[in-house]
Amino acid sequence: MIIPLKYIRLFVDAAGLSHFQDCTLPLATRDFAPPTTPLEATDFIPAMGFAVVRFAANWSGPWHASPYRQWFFMMSGSITVTAGDGIERTLNTGDAIFLDDQGTKGHLTRVKGDQEVIAVGVRVADAL
């Protein structure tokens, strides 16, 4: 059985403006960790490394692009991201976003509320 895992993609259009897109990763039932019972999992996605990131409570940053293509997985707290087109999305604990807006005006990021945010960024190759 194929089960989709939802995530948000932040991408750049031909005019250089960033936008959000709702996407899914296919999870399939597989023997992921034998001899346990099967689990739902994606195929392995090659990664170049990861970093744990802490945003202080009430942190806010200027317009910036992601320095490289990366997955961002929210471990705790909430952030609001504003794309170049003005659309905002709030990411909460457990949410995932794929940042792919290099070389542009990028996006705004701010911590929502007065609690710190912990996230894990996973860098991926420039071309998948």
Show where each model-derived region lies.
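A generic structural signal for short beta-strands and their flanking turns/coil linkers
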Residues: P46-A51, Q70, M75-G77, K105
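Short acidic, Pro/Gly- and aromatic-enriched capping/linker segments at domain boundaries
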Residues: M1-V12
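A short glycine-rich, His/Asp/Glu-containing loop-to-beta-strand
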Residues: A14-W63, V117-L128
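Short beta-strand His + acidic residue motifs that chelate non-heme Fe in jelly-roll/DSBH
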Residues: G61-W63, V81-T82, T90, L99, ...
